[in-house]
Each structure stands twice: as structure tokens, then as C-alpha cells.
């Protein structure tokens, strides 16, 4: 009994130290994590091999030794009856308490080790409990009987159970084919008004059409979702400070198609990224040069340009997007706030041509500052939901994001916050997912993601 009591005291001390460590980690700036992760997912091989649990909770648990759970006591009495089993009312309850303490310690160790693998920029985040998801689903199903705006999942290939088990963060809608040119018009929930009538809005996964250099600049067709993956290459002499980013379009059976590559220029007063569809030549003079991303001094505002010439009148340089991050001078904790301004769309789903290099017209940023919204579209990142139970910010990425990070975001329009124009998030140390749809093109979406990678003096 004295051995068990001393063991319990040690366990209690270790548990208090671990809880203090967790509270200290949670005091750092908040991050955003996907709220649709599996609650009881298996541990990775690295963590399971580094931890050894000496516990047995099977039907023969009552014959385990309290000092060494791996040892099975033999029958020592002449009648073949185990002397430990004769006192089951006391020793069995003691063993149960000991095993319960060990399991609690194991859960705390697993939680600590999982925090060390998360994004080092902010505090750990957990997932929403299953009963909260069910409560949210029942409320949504009651309201869905009335006609309202379309609310469909971002991942249309999920089965019915995955789609209906939405959490409180809300599910992203799917834009059906054949809708009006504006992506923010209301539609019926089942999509039958547009002839789809399949319950998922008829949205399909996009594929490359035509040449790569033309495809990456063309706005996504309505009713098409492009699922992409961004990999960060930090290997080499100077790629620790100037990594190269590669954008691939995901296809079936693990296949992928290269779309764009991006690199930060070394000799530049401000952050300046070159984007090219040629992965072997990421320079302004390359044939595959598609455009660039340029920031201001503080890293709070980014402008996306195409490959046009600023001095040319025949093919002037066009503004593709402006990304603005809210300043955080006082150091308030929480996720980032960003605003994305895009050129408006014409009736034939083409971008309005806006050039800040043309002295006869104003650029996207100037139009936005003057509140002239006739030819521009303003998007915002979807506000994450704060979960009091898990003490974390959560968003529903529908299985596309698996790690917490301050870089995780979803872009929506104020008139239809359920239509996810773009979402971006971390899946591993140097791998990120990027999904986009109308009215974005691959060049715009990739540049927005690059702005999230760049360091921001006044935002962190």
C-alpha cells in the first residue's frame, strides 16, 4: 500500500507540472485550428515509439502486480487459487485507481507532445466535441426547411454523414453551376433552381484547361472548385530565409499538376515575390513569368500585379488584388484579420481591367480608400469561433486542414458569409492546402497565400 501511495503522489506532482505547462502555452497568441479533426485519432509512429505504457486493463487485470503491471502473478496456493484474487474487493479497486492514474498521466503526456508538434507561432487548439456538432446539426436541420441561401460543404465528395455533422463554426456553401455572375446571390438549398438538384449544388473539381500560363490567369468558372497544395522548399544555402513555394493542383489517386512557383527576391527594399509557371526559372525575365506580389514597408499591405509592363501603353501592368492585414501594435491576442480587394467581374465572367500604372485611372487600393466599390469586390477572412470548452479559435475546414496555425483562414463576402471563396491552412511543417473558386484565379489565390507566409512587423 505504501508503494502505491508514493506512486500516486509522484503522479499528482507530474500532473500539476504538466497542467502548469499547458496553461503557460495557452497564454501565447491564439491560433486557428480546424474544428472537424478526429477527436480520437491514433498517435503517430514517432510518438507511440517514444512512449511506453505499462498497463493492462483486460479481463485478467486483477492478477497484475501493483508494483510491476507487466508481471503476471502465478498461483501460489496448493488449491491453485491465486491469493491476490481472494481479496478482489480491495486489491482490484486499488489496481483500478493505479491504472486510472497512469492513464491520466498518459493523456497529459500525449497532449504535451502534440503541442510541441503544432505551429510554434501561437497556443494549442483542440477540436469541438461531438455532442456540440450534433446540437448544431439539429438546429441547422430545423431551419433548413425554410427557403434560404445555399449552405453546402466545401468538400462535395464527403458522404451524407460527414456533411450533416457540421459544427458551430458553420459549413461552407457550394456554388452551383449556372448561377448568375455574382457569386453572392441567394439560391435554394437543394440547388434544384439551377437544374442541379443533387444536394451538393453540382460543383465539380476543376482541371487544367489549355496552356498553364493562360489557365492560371483565368478566373475559375462558376460551379467549379480547385483543390490545390502548396509546398515550401527551405533546403539549400539561402532557402532558409528565401524559400521557394510550389503550387500544385491535386488530382485523383495522389496525382498533382504543377501550376505556379514563387520566390522572394533577395535584393529588395520591401517584400517582393516573383511568381512564374516555370519552376526552373523564377525570374522577371523568364518566359513563364506571370506576375509579382509586393508589400509595403511594414508588411501590412500587399499588391498583386500581372506580367504587364508598367511603362507600356499597349499591355500595361494590371492590378489583380490587394491584401490588407489589420495592424496589431498593442499586441492583442487572437487570429489575424485580413481584407482582400479584387477587381470586379463583368457579365461574361471576366475581370475588370484596373491599372495603378495608368495615370488616367486609379488603382484597386485607391478605389477602396475612396469607397468607390463599383468595379471592385471586398472580401474578409471568416471570423473563427471561440470555444469556451476548449479555449481555442476554431473553423470548419472540412478535413482539408489538420494543424493549428495563425496562417489558417477562409475568405468570404459580407453579403454571403457561407460562400467560401478561398481557404488556406497547414497540414504539415512545409505543406499547406489551398482551395479556391469563382471569382478567383490561381495567380490571385497563390499570391494571397504568399502574403500569409511573409513576416509582418506590425501585425504579430
From Swiss-Prot:
GO terms for biological process, alphabetical: endocytosis; glucose homeostasis; negative regulation of opsin-mediated signaling pathway; protein localization to cilium; response to sucrose; sensory perception of sound; triglyceride homeostasis
Disulfide bonds: none
Modified residues (Phosphoserine): 153
Biased composition (Polar residues): 85-97
Subcellular localization(s) per the UniProt record: Cytoplasm; Nucleus; Cell projection, Cilium membrane; Cell projection, Rhabdomere
Effect of deleting the gene: Viable and fertile however flies display a decreased climbing index and extracellular sound-evoked potentials are completely abolished. This hearing defect is likely due to the abnormal localization of the two transient receptor potential channels iav and nompC, as well as eys within the cilia. There is no localization of iav to the proximal cilia, and nompc which is typically found in the distal cilia, is localized to the proximal cilia. Also eys displays a much broader expression pattern.
Biased composition (Low complexity): 130-145
PROSITE patterns: TUB_1, TUB_2
Region annotation (Disordered) ranges: 75-97, 115-208
Keywords: Cell membrane, Cell projection, Cytoplasm, Lipid-binding, Membrane, Nucleus, Phosphoprotein
Tissue: Detected in sensory neurons which have a ciliary structure such as the chordotonal neurons, Orco-expressing olfactory receptor neurons, labellar gustatory receptor neurons and in the femoral chordotonal organ (at protein level). In the chordotonal neurons of the Johnston's organ expressed in the proximal to distal cilia, with lower levels of expression in the distal portion (at protein level). Also detected in the salivary glands and antenna (at protein level). Expressed in photoreceptor cells (at protein level). At stage 9 expression is detected in a subset of neuroblasts.
GO molecular function: lipid binding
SUPFAM superfamilies (alphabetical): Tubby C-terminal domain-like (SSF54518)
Function text: Functions in regulating protein trafficking, retinal maintenance and lipid storage. Protects photoreceptor cells R1 to R6 against light-induced retinal degeneration by stimulating norpA-mediated endocytosis of the rhodopsin ninaE (Rh1). In the auditory receptor neurons, functions as a cilia trafficking regulator of various transient receptor potential (TRP) channel components including iav and nompC. Likely to deliver pre-ciliary vesicles containing membrane proteins such as iav and nompC to the intraflagellar transport complex (IFT) at the cilia base.
Similarity comment: family membership: Belongs to the TUB family.
Name by which UniProt lists this protein: Protein king tubby
Organism: Drosophila melanogaster (Fruit fly)
Encoding gene (name): ktub
